[in-house]
């Protein structure tokens, strides 16, 4: 770690003589903080306090001054080290943090699985005959568009409620216990789905299961971003997208098996519901032993617990590990303190819209996640149903869905490689551009009724899935964790995910009307609509979405505070830890307040 040996030696010197402070002794009365020129040249930016040669112990004011600036120095050092840390070093230093993050994010496998089987049920013959109605014109059985819309609305409404409950729950008991409670309720609510005998029971079960799903959506992203360093942030936040895909792939495989072996048996839809009981218990046990987010602990003033939590995420032993823990805690303290000075209130949902800075951060986070719906990804979730309505056989529709999710997994892994060469914004925008082109081609093929055009539109939807999971799908999970301030991160992510859910409800209604033979019956021609909407999302990204690749949370805070435009985020360099020399007429009665105010002004 950069300058780590210096910091270890500096701390040893400080503890050996409590009267000695970083800097040079002068033969005059105590003066305000000055920066040592040689230290500047060394790149260490160590602030020191000048004092008289009196052998008496330093005054309480000087102690406070030194403590504050030591914390600021440590915060700066931790921030610089995090920004310059290579991937291999990060994995070697934070292996346990990565493992805990992967465990927590695995809860999203269940949400990806649960939401995917619902869309696949609409193409399952036994489900259609059990809960659907027969089309008088075609003689085919299908679930009515109104019920499809209703079931979608139920689980999304449940997610919205669950997300809103997540905020106060996290404030009260933290991330770990909130996730464990959500897993318990998910296992309990699954009984309703397994024993369903009507669409009404399925609607109730979906609404109740949606509440823990909403919790998973928020906390997996915020936990991954807070427990891991910058070098691992993209990989561990975008792993959430992989978990979604693993769940959807698992669902597609189970549904294909149900279509082949249980086409005329109630096990065709009961077995997929029952498999939801596999993960909650082992995941709850694992999360119980996971460390709490150090950011949450520092916000609660539980600094010793934050240090213990950080020790559990780091490898190695000895003074280097302890120094790294101290640096990180000091950085978190300084970051949160600077954010608190922007408002006198505790973090609440209203704070997300309180001033121009937070309004901008909230807007970008919400629209960024809403882009996952407006880019046409909801159509991918109904891919099996889409393939059927495009003229592909039921068996081939399920096969196409499996291929589609496999391509999505490969694309997400490819995005990890691409993130080394392209920024967050680049992947988001390029993905949208490619999807726009492919959607227009799908719409054009929908104007033809030949077998080749039907197979072509189905194949191109797989191309949409590939570009979606290469660009916008994974990168959104990283962006929404970086845009909010640390103090409002959980609440901003909740608002953003609920924005996504509301937009998804609208998009789902449109898709079901577009594909249902009793409604608009657009089929593949719906590609034109989603191509236009995807292009509009691309225009917003170009105008409003900042580039945050390579930026630490402290730097992002400073860039938003300075009002840097979206397209200049990448090139603008800031130093959030520069400390101004206070004016001569400043009061020395409260040195802590004066100095902290000076720091906050930066």
UniProtKB/Swiss-Prot annotation:
Function: High-affinity uptake of maltose and maltotriose. Also transports alpha-methylglucoside, glucose and turanose but not melezitose or trehalose.
Top-rank taxon, per record: Eukaryota
Sequence ranges on the Cytoplasmic membrane side: 1-106, 164-178, 222-234, 292-363, 419-426, 481-492, 547-602
Alphabetical list of NCBIfam families matching this protein: SP
Protein name: Alpha-glucosides permease MPH3
Gene name, Swiss-Prot/TrEMBL: MPH3
Location of the region described as Disordered in the Swiss-Prot/TrEMBL record: 582-602
Keyword hit for Transmembrane helix: yes
Organism field: Saccharomyces cerevisiae (strain ATCC 204508 / S288c) (Baker's yeast)
Keywords, alphabetical: Cell membrane, Maltose metabolism, Membrane, Sugar transport, Transmembrane, Transmembrane helix, Transport
This protein's record includes keyword Nucleotide-binding: no
Subcellular location: Cell membrane
Membrane disposition: Multi-pass membrane protein
Coiled-coil regions listed in the entry: none
Induction statement: By maltose and maltotriose. Repressed by glucose.
GO biological process: alpha-glucoside transport; carbohydrate transport; maltose metabolic process
Sample GO molecular function, one term: alpha-glucoside transmembrane transporter activity
GO cellular component: cell periphery; fungal-type vacuole; membrane; plasma membrane
Family according to the record: Belongs to the major facilitator superfamily. Sugar transporter (TC 2.A.1.1) family.
Transmembrane domains' residue ranges: 107-127, 143-163, 179-199, 201-221, 235-255, 271-291, 364-384, 398-418, 427-447, 460-480, 493-513, 526-546
Ranges of the Extracellular topological domain: 128-142, 200, 256-270, 385-397, 448-459, 514-525
Bias kind Basic and acidic residues: ranges: 582-595
């Amino acid at each position: 770690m950069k300058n780590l040996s210096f910091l270890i030696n500096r701390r040893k010197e400080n503890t050996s003589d409590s009267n000695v402070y970083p800097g040079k002794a002068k033969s005059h009365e105590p003066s305000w903080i000055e920066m040592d020129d040689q230290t500047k040249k060394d790149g260490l930016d160590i602030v020191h306090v000048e004092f008289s040669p009196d052998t008496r112990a330093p005054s309480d004011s000087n102690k406070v001054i030194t403590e504050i600036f030591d914390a600021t120095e440590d915060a700066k050092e931790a921030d610089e080290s995090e920004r310059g840390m290579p991937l291999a070093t990060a994995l070697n230093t934070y292996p346990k943090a990565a493992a805990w993050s992967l465990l927590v994010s695995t809860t999203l496998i269940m949400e990806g699985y649960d939401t995917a089987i619902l869309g696949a049920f609409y193409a399952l013959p036994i489900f259609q005959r059990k809960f659907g109605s027969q089309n008088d014109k075609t003689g085919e059985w299908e679930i009515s568009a109104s019920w499809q819309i209703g079931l979608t609305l139920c689980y999304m409404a449940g997610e919205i409620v669950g997300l809103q409950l997540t905020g106060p729950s996290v404030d009260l008991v933290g991330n770990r216990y909130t996730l464990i409670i959500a897993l318990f309720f998910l296992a309990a609510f699954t009984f309703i789905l397994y024993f369903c005998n009507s669409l009404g029971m399925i609607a109730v079960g979906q609404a109740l299961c949606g509440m823990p799903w909403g919790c998973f959506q928020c906390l997996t992203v915020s936990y991954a971003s807070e427990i891991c360093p910058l070098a691992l942030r993209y990989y561990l936040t975008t792993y959430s997208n992989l978990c979604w895909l693993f769940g959807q792939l698992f669902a597609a495989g189970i549904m294909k098996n149900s279509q082949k072996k249980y086409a005329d048996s109630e096990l065709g839809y009961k077995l997929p519901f029952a498999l939801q009981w596999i993960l909650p218990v082992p995941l709850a046990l694992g999360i119980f032993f996971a460390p709490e987010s150090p950011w949450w602990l520092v916000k609660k003033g539980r600094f010793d617990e934050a240090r213990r939590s950080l020790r559990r995420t780091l490898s190695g032993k000895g003074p280097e590990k302890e120094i790294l823990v101290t640096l990180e805690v000091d950085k978190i303290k300084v970051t949160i303190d600077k954010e608190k000075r922007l408002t006198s209130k505790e973090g609440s949902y209203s704070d997300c819209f309180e001033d121009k800075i937070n309004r901008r951060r909230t807007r970008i986070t919400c629209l960024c996640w809403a882009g996952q719906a407006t880019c046409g990804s909801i159509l991918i979730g109904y891919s099996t149903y889409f393939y059927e309505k495009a003229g592909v056989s039921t068996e081939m529709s399920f096969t196409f869905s499996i291929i589609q999710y496999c391509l999505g997994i490969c694309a997400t892994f490819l995005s990890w490689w691409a993130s080394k060469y392209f920024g967050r914004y680049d992947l988001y925008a390029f993905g949208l551009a490619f999807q726009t082109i492919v959607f227009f081609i799908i719409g054009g093929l929908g104007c033809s009724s030949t077998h080749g055009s039907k197979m072509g539109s189905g194949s191109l939807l797989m191309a949409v899935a590939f570009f979606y999971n290469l660009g916008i799908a994974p990168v959104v999970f990283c962006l929404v964790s970086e845009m909010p301030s640390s103090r409002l991160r959980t609440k901003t992510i909740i608002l953003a995910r609920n924005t996504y859910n509301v937009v998804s409800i609208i998009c789902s209604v449109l898709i079901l009307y577009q594909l249902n033979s009793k409604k608009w019956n657009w089929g593949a021609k719906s590609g034109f609509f989603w191509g236009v909407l995807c292009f509009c999302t691309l225009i917003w990204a170009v105008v409003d979405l900042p580039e945050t690749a390579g930026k630490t949370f402290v730097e992002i805070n400073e860039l938003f505070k300075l009002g840097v435009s979206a397209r200049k985020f990448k090139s603008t360099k800031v130093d959030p830890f520069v400390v101004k020399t206070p004016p001569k007429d400043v009061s020395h009665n409260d040195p802590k307040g004066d100095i902290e105010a000076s720091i906050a002004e930066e």
